[in-house]
A protein has these predicted regions:
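Acidic, proline/glycine-rich low-complexity IDRs
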Residues: 1-14, 66, 77-115
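Long, contiguous N-terminal structural blocks used for assembly/anchoring
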Residues: 1-60
Length: 115
C-alpha cells in the first residue's frame, strides 16, 4: 500500500487492478481486494455491456473486445463505490467512470465519459 499524490489516495495494486482508499485502511484488506478482483473479472462483460451504448455514441461502432483492449487499468475506489479508467485508449482526453452499488459488480449506475 502506498500513497499516490497524483490520485490523492492510498493505492494497492492486485492482478492488474488498482484499489484506492481516501484514508489508509486500518484493517487487513487482502480478502476484500481478492473478492473485488474476482467479481470484477467475473462480471467484466456485464460491466462493458453497461458502458457500451455510451461508448458507441462517442466513438462509433466498437465491440466488447475492443472495449476490453482499450479500457486500461481500472482504479477501484472502494470507499466511494466508483471505478475510474484514467488510462483508456479510445482517446487521450477523456476519463471513463461508473458507480457500483455492491461488491459483486452487479448493480452498476451512472456511467460517464468526462474530459
Amino acid at each position: 500500500m502506498e500513497f499516490r499524490k497524483d490520485l490523492g489516495q492510498y493505492i494497492y495494486e492486485y492482478e492488474g487492478l488498482i484499489f484506492a482508499w481516501d484514508e489508509e485502511p486500518e484493517e487487513d484488506i487482502q480478502n476484500t481486494v481478492e473478492s473485488l478482483a474476482e467479481n470484477y473479472f467475473k462480471n467484466l462483460d456485464v460491466i462493458i455491456d453497461f458502458m457500451l451504448a455510451d461508448i458507441k455514441e462517442i466513438y462509433g461502432e466498437v465491440t466488447v473486445e475492443d472495449v476490453k483492449e482499450k479500457l486500461g487499468k481500472p482504479v477501484i475506489d472502494y470507499n466511494n463505490g466508483k471505478v475510474t479508467y484514467y488510462e483508456q485508449s479510445f482517446d487521450d482526453c477523456h476519463i471513463f467512470e461508473f458507480e457500483f452499488m455492491d461488491d459483486a459488480f452487479e448493480d452498476l449506475q451512472y456511467f460517464s465519459i468526462d474530459g
